[in-house]
């Protein structure tokens, strides 16, 4: 097996988990979703990120029994945080798994990631989709868990990362789910889809191909000019022992903010092209008074062979910067050790 010093594989049900799990005195972090987006999530299991990742079939949510069994194996007694992308199947199944785990005496909190500014509702979601901020939340919260954050403090940090992150993507070609044997959608050779979802969901607008600089400007300005997004989400209240509705509002990006810039390949775009996007993004951020203090560039959330990219901007404070810089050792992301 690849990376035997970092991860183990559990079959029936399927999930990947840390070789040293459970880690004594540490809150465990579990995430997951449909396959086809590698290295997310399995490539981010290891020191400083996830304790376990649960893969579904291609573009299909994992089932509750996967998350339940993963939680049981990685739980050290300090509780488990589920980081959940906002897709209807993921939300439903992670919620069910959390309820099942609580019945077995495991403390579990779920935090939703809903950072895609392209559309409010889509084929797979109610509300905004969870995309690029997911990886950033897994890294930052993973480091905080290693530092000894308790479950409630870790959930609050994850929620803070989510509301401060915004993403948007573009597709130049479709992707082909193996079981379907045909492209998820059709695009002309001279067309692109702005605001595409990671499963090929329709975006904000289809238009003629533009230059890399023009595409970057479309994405970046959509993110930067996104203001006061409010929504109601459901979270577990440990005091009341029930699911409750809470109101969230994303703070607006403003002059002087420090941000992490994440330029991501959708899978079919070569890494040599991504710095072109980053160069223009850096220029736009400078003009808007945003200071890029950290960056991540590469194929971290893919959509099979789709050609395209996405941009994520995360407004950072000192706490997030500290945990972003902290050591990490996973198959898909590592530094500092």
Residue locations for each model-derived region?
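Glycine-rich phosphate/diphosphate-binding loops and the adjacent beta-loop-alpha structural elements
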Residues: 182-274
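C-terminal non-catalytic interaction/assembly regions of soluble proteins
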Residues: 242-337
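N-terminal amphipathic/basic leader segments beginning at the initiator methionine
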Residues: 1-29, 318, 326-337
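Glycine-rich oxoanion-binding loops at beta->alpha junctions
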Residues: 46-77
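Short glycine-rich or small-residue beta-strand-to-loop segments that form or flank ligand, phosphate
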Residues: 27-34, 50-53, 79-88, 95-98, ...
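Internal, active-site/partner-interface "lid" segment
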Residues: 120-128, 138-204
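Short, acidic/small-residue loops that bind anionic groups at enzyme active sites
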Residues: 53-58, 102-124, 289-291
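Short Gly/Thr/Asp-enriched flexible loops that form oxyanion-binding sites at enzyme active sites
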Residues: 91-105, 124, 273-279
């Amino acid at each position: 097996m690849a990376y035997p010093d970092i991860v183990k594989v559990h079959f029936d049900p399927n999930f990947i988990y840390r070789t040293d799990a459970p880690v004594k005195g540490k809150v465990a972090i579990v995430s997951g979703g449909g396959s086809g987006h590698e290295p997310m999530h399995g490539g981010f299991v290891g020191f400083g990120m996830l304790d376990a990742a649960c893969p579904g079939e291609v573009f299909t949510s994992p089932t509750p029994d996967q998350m339940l069994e993963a939680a049981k194996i990685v739980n050290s007694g300090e509780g488990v945080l589920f980081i959940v992308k906002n897709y209807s199947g993921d939300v439903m199944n992670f919620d069910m798994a959390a309820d099942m785990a609580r019945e077995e005496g495991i403390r579990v909190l779920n935090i939703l990631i809903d950072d895609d500014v392209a559309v409010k509702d889509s084929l797979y979601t109610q509300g905004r989709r969870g995309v690029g901020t997911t990886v950033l939340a897994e890294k930052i919260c993973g480091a905080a868990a290693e530092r000894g954050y308790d479950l409630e403090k870790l959930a609050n940090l994850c929620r803070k990362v989510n509301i401060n992150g915004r993403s948007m993507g573009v597709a130049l070609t479709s992707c082909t789910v193996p079981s379907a044997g045909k492209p998820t959608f059709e695009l002309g050779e001279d067309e692109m889809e702005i605001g595409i979802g990671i499963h090929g969901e329709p975006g904000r607008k289809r238009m003629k191909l533009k230059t890399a600089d023009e595409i970057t400007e479309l994405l970046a300005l959509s993110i930067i000019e996104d203001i006061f997004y409010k929504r109601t989400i459901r979270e577990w209240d440990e005091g009341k022992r029930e699911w409750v509705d809470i109101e969230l509002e994303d703070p607006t990006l403003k002059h002087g903010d420090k941000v992490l810039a994440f330029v991501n390949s959708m899978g079919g775009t070569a890494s040599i092209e991504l710095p072109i996007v980053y160069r223009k993004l850096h220029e736009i951020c400078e003009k808007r008074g945003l200071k890029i203090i950290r960056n991540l560039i590469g194929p971290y959330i893919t959509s099979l062979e789709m050609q395209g990219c996405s941009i994520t901007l995360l407004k950072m404070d000192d706490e997030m910067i500290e945990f972003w810089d902290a050591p990490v050792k996973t198959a898909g992301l590592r530094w500092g050790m």
